[in-house]
């Protein structure tokens, strides 16, 4: 009986995740889909956003063009109240040019990734009314690459912010 219950819970979670993913991908434009990747892995929804869509270079300020995409993601987050959301900043392995950095409090990629994640969290709260207690911000620096940092394309893929949506 217990195992059957676990299977039912997992099945319900998987189907909710598929609905969530389908709703989000349907709401995104073709242009947005070039810079947003949505995946479901082990019952968790991962939304990966390209850094050049979200931020100005070397900065953690949210770009104007990110607003529409973030509004669609915020709507999904608001619709799925039984899910927690982790915002995770990631960078490539190129050290920050601290002399040229537009924000003086960025010492390295750890700082940049954490500040970028925090910016997205605050943007979701301040612009779209997402409940703060559902959101967590974290930075991974260059230590969680999804591609090789040996090529420009790989570095570009590693410069991302992930929105990770998990059942409570």
How should each PLM-predicted stretch be described?
Residues 54-68, 72, 80, 90-168:
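Periplasmic OmpA-like peptidoglycan-binding domain that tethers envelope proteins to the cell wall
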Residues 75, 83-86:
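Terminal ABC-like ATPase head and other globular end-domains that cap long coiled-coil arms
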Residues 45-50:
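Short, aliphatic-rich beta-strand segments
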Residues 1-39:
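Extracellular/lumenal/periplasmic "stalk" regions immediately C-terminal to a signal peptide or transmembrane helix
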Residues 32-34, 38, 70-79:
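Short amphipathic alpha-helices and their capping/turn segments at secondary-structure boundaries
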Residues 38, 85, 135-137:
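Generic structural signal for residues in well-ordered beta-strands
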Residues 40-44:
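Short Gly/Ser/Thr- and Asp/Glu-enriched loop/turn motifs at secondary-structure junctions
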């Amino acid at each position: 009986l217990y195992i059957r219950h676990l299977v039912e819970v997992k099945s319900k979670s998987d189907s909710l995740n598929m609905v969530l993913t389908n709703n989000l991908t349907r709401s995104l434009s073709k242009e947005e889909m070039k810079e947003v990747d949505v995946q479901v892995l082990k019952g968790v929804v991962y939304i990966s956003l390209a850094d050049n869509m979200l931020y100005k270079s070397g900065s953690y300020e949210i770009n104007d063009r990110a607003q529409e995409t973030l509004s669609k993601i915020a709507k999904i987050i608001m619709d799925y109240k039984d899910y927690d959301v982790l915002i995770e900043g990631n960078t490539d392995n190129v050290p920050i040019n601290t002399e040229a950095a537009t924000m003086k409090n960025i010492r390295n990629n750890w700082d940049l990734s954490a500040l970028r994640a925090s910016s997205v969290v605050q943007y979701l709260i301040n612009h779209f009314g997402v409940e703060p207690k559902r959101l967590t911000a974290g930075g991974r620096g260059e230590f969680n690459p999804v591609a090789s940092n040996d090529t420009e394309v790989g570095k570009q893929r590693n410069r991302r912010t992930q929105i990770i949506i998990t059942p409570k």
